[in-house]
Amino acid sequence: MSKRGRGGSAGGKFRISLGLPVGAVINCADNTGAKNLYVIAVHGIRGRLNRLPAAGVGDMFVATVKKGKPELRKKVMPAVVIRQRKPFRRRDGVFLYFEDNAGVIVNNKGEMKGSAITGPVAKECADLWPRIASNAGSIA
């Protein structure tokens, strides 16, 4: 029986190490007023019994704001991971990791709620999300 998946299509997402399981608290790197994001669920994870769903760079996840403006707190919203501490391998063989875990708040279409991103954005994320790439200060 064949495995389900993207089938390695051109322009598809390359498999990277997933460093942010459900329950992780990460920095919010945009100017929406949120300080950190709490990972509730990860989009597109089918899962396995007793395995926590986890997100990596470029993954969309469901989040809540734990610290930040009161109008953003206690609401469920989508977000995208732009940096992760866990090393992940690029196609050219280099292993890359960042000094923090960070994400940005988006809408369901992937358009950013804020208008600026602090710090670098991973190239893998910028390739998948053009609206995030356009607001990125630097792409690493």
Curated annotation (Swiss-Prot):
Transmembrane feature ranges: none
Example of a GO MF term: large ribosomal subunit rRNA binding
Cellular component GO terms held in the UniProt record: cytosolic large ribosomal subunit
Keyword set includes Ribonucleoprotein: yes
Keyword presence, Ubl conjugation: no
Pfam families given in the database record: Ribosomal_L14
InterPro entries in alphabetical order: Ribosomal_uL14 (IPR000218), Ribosomal_uL14_CS (IPR019972), Ribosomal_uL14_sf (IPR036853)
Key words, A-Z: Ribonucleoprotein, Ribosomal protein
Gene Ontology BP terms: translation
Coiled coil: none
Signal peptide: none
HAMAP family according to UniProt: Ribosomal_uL14
Family of this protein: Belongs to the universal ribosomal protein uL14 family.
NCBIfam families in the record: PRK08571.1
Protein name per its UniProtKB record: Large ribosomal subunit protein uL14
